[in-house]
C-alpha cells in the first residue's frame, strides 16, 4: 500500500499552486504538483486552467511526458504570453513498485530510500507556456518498502525571513533525510513547520505545497482536516 500526505498553504486566499491525486482505471495513481508564476487571482486562474487540462488529458494511455506535451500545447494557446507554470507529473504503478515522472521546469522532488539514500527528481523539460514545441522526458525508478517520494512547490525552499535570507533546499533535504520521520504525515508537517519558523512573522510571499508518498504495508484510508492524508492499497 501507500500513505499519502498533502500540506497546502496558499500565500493568499486563492492560490497559484495546484496539487492533485488521481486514481487511474488501471490501478495506477497519478500525482500532480503545479505552480503558476506569481500568486493571487491571476495565478489562481492559471491554476484552474491547468486543473481542467489535467482532468481532460488521457491519463491511462499517455506517459507523464506525453501528458505534459498535451497540456503544454493547450496551455500555450489558452494563456497570455507572460503566463508560465511548472508542473511535475508522477505515475505510480498499480503494484506500487515503479514510478515514472516528468517535470516541466518544476522544483526538485526527492526519492528517499529505506537505507537513507536520497535521489533528486530533476526537471525533464522547460516550463509550461513558453513554446508549443517544448519536449519532455520520462524518468523511471523502482520503489521498495519504506521508500518516500517528496514533491514540493518552490515556495517552500524559497521562503524568506525578515532579513531576506532564503530557507534553501538544504534545510528541506535535512528534514527528508532525518530517519525520525518514518511517516508521511510527520515529514510533510515538519517541512512546513521548518519553513514557517524560518519566515517567523514575515508575510508569506508564495504558496507552499508538499506532497509525500510512502510505500507501506497498510491498505486503509484515513482523512485529516488540515492536511489531506490517506493510505491507499
Language model regions located:
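Short amphipathic alpha-helical interaction patches enriched in hydrophobic/aromatic residues
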Residues: 54-58, 75, 160, 176-180, ...
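Short, well-structured alpha-helical segments that form the helix of a local strand-helix-strand
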Residues: 64-76, 172, 184-196
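… and, occasionally, acidic/histidine-rich disordered N-termini of signaling adaptors
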Residues: 1-150, 200-233
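Catalytic/regulatory signature loops of cyclic-dinucleotide turnover enzymes
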Residues: 157
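Divalent-cation-assisted or electrostatically stabilized phosphate/pyrophosphate-binding catalytic cores
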Residues: 165-180
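Cytochrome P450 core scaffold surrounding the K-helix E-X-X-R motif
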Residues: 111-114, 160-166
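Alpha-helix boundary/capping and short turn/kink residues
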Residues: 62, 80-81, 162, 181, ...
Amino acid at each position: 500500500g501507500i500513505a499519502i500526505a498533502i500540506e497546502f498553504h496558499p500565500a493568499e486566499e486563492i492560490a497559484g499552486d495546484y496539487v492533485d491525486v488521481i486514481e487511474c482505471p488501471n490501478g495506477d495513481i497519478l500525482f500532480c504538483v503545479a505552480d503558476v508564476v506569481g500568486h493571487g487571482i491571476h495565478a489562481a486562474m492559471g491554476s484552474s486552467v491547468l486543473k481542467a487540462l489535467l482532468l481532460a488529458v488521457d491519463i491511462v494511455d499517455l506517459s507523464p511526458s506525453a501528458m505534459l506535451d498535451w497540456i503544454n500545447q493547450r496551455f500555450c494557446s489558452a494563456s497570455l504570453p507572460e503566463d508560465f507554470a511548472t508542473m511535475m507529473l508522477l505515475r505510480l504503478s498499480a503494484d506500487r513498485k515503479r514510478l515514472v515522472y516528468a517535470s516541466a521546469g518544476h522544483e526538485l522532488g526527492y526519492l528517499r530510500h529505506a537505507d537513507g539514500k536520497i535521489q533528486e527528481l530533476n526537471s525533464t523539460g522547460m516550463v509550461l507556456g513558453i513554446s508549443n514545441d517544448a519536449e519532455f522526458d520520462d524518468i523511471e525508478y523502482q520503489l521498495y518498502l519504506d521508500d518516500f517520494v517528496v514533491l514540493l512547490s518552490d515556495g517552500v525552499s524559497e521562503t524568506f525571513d525578515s532579513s531576506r535570507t532564503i530557507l534553501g533546499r538544504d534545510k528541506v533535504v535535512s528534514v527528508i533525510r532525518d530517519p525520525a520521520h518514518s511517516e508521511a504525515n510527520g515529514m510533510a508537517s515538519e517541512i512546513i513547520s521548518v519553513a514557517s519558523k524560518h519566515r517567523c512573522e514575515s508575510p508569506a510571499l508564495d504558496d507552499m505545497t508538499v506532497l509525500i508518498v510512502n510505500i507501506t504495508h497498510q491498505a486503509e484510508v484515513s482523512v485529516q482536516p488540515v492536511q489531506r492524508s490517506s493510505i491507499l492499497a
